Amino acid sequence: MIIYKCIISGDEMFSDAFKVKESANGIFYEVDGKITTRTDNIDDSLISANASAEETTDCTDSSVVSGVDIVLNHKLQETSFDKKSYKVYIKDYVKAIKQKLQEEKPERVDAFMADVAEEVKEILNNLKNYQFFTGENMNPEGMVGLLDYREDGTTPYMLFFKDGLLAEKC
């Protein structure tokens, strides 16, 4: 299995357990997800108590969680942006990715910088369509994944900047 981690925060963003493809210009990974509902039950046998000494038996509560499987599996945390705050974030994020690329993959810098401006403009034009998710540690300098839905309105997918990720085999 391959886990994709943010190169800035080290947070897990997604894995190859999902359908992953590159966007047309290769700047994003598009990760297809599914809406799922999970029940988190607590095993009563794990609660240390003498059941025979109890007068009444209380059942432990279970919780039901619904959401996109990518978000739930990798414990992504929802955050929010308006146009102004996203511009501030993305400017700093692109600068950080450019710096990392200069250190580790200098041949990618020009292509990344050429493509990112056009993609950011597209994101800003459709900002109202996206939900934003950070990694589990909610590092404000780390990657923010963009959640949107396909044309059918029911199939969720997320966009992650390819150059902001480190692929790690498990």
Curated annotation (Swiss-Prot):
Alphabetical list of SUPFAM superfamilies matching this protein: Mss4-like (SSF51316)
Domain of life assignment: Eukaryota
Subcellular location per the Swiss-Prot or TrEMBL entry: Cytoplasm
Gene3D superfamilies: Metal Binding Protein, Guanine Nucleotide Exchange Factor, Chain A
Cytoplasm found in the keyword field: yes
Statement: the UniProt record of this protein carries the keyword Transcription regulation: no
Molecular function (Gene Ontology), one example: calcium ion binding
Keywords, sorted A to Z: Calcium, Cytoplasm
UniProt-listed InterPro entries: Mss4-like_sf, Mss4/transl-control_tumour, TCTP, Translation_control_tumour_CS, Translational_control_tumour_p
GO cellular component: cytoplasm
Positions of the TCTP domain: 1-170
PANTHER family (alphabetical): TRANSLATIONALLY CONTROLLED TUMOR PROTEIN-RELATED, TRANSLATIONALLY-CONTROLLED TUMOR PROTEIN
Function comment: Involved in calcium binding and microtubule stabilization.
Family to which this protein belongs: Belongs to the TCTP family.
UniProt name for this protein: Translationally-controlled tumor protein homolog
